[in-house]
Amino acid sequence: MAMYPRELKWGVAHIYSSFNNTHVHITDLTGAETVARVTGGMVVKADREKPSPYAAMIAASRAAQKAMERGIAAIHIKVRAPGGHGPKTPGPGAQAAIRALARAGFIIGRIEDVTPIPHDTTRRPGGRRGRRV
């Protein structure tokens, strides 16, 4: 006997974590329809707390609650850092957001990193002599 219902409704949790904020965006499998979208800045008062793991945790749990109300029971997770010219590693809120989604009761499918990595990039800002401070 299976523990879960035969047909699970799957979704995709897109977690964008920079050093300034954390976005948790849950969509259907195609990514076309938004189910829930919460950011760290929406759940804390002070701007300096937006990138914190606490803000990411609260944002992820709120998004999870909205998604469960819409019937999503299992999710794949896509983690993204700024990438390109910016940092290629996710910010401090990424891990907290993943843990919060797991604790919310979702069945976790795949966790993948979708940070845009340039293969021979365009020129970085700053010019030939660099950024003069």
UniProtKB/Swiss-Prot annotation:
> Its Gene Ontology molecular function terms?
rRNA binding; structural constituent of ribosome
Keywords annotated in UniProt: Ribonucleoprotein, Ribosomal protein, RNA-binding, rRNA-binding
List the GO cellular component terms.
Answer: ribonucleoprotein complex; ribosome
Q: Which residues form a coiled coil?
A: none
Keyword ATP-binding attributed: no
A single Gene Ontology biological process assigned to it is: translation
One matching Pfam family? Ribosomal_S11
Keyword Ribosomal protein set for record: yes
What interactions and quaternary structure are annotated? Answer: Part of the 30S ribosomal subunit.
- State the family named in the UniProt similarity comment for this chain: Belongs to the universal ribosomal protein uS11 family.
According to its UniProt entry, what is the function of this protein? Located on the platform of the 30S subunit.
What name has this protein been given in UniProt? Small ribosomal subunit protein uS11
Native species of this protein? Answer: Aeropyrum pernix (strain ATCC 700893 / DSM 11879 / JCM 9820 / NBRC 100138 / K1)
| Gene designation | rps11
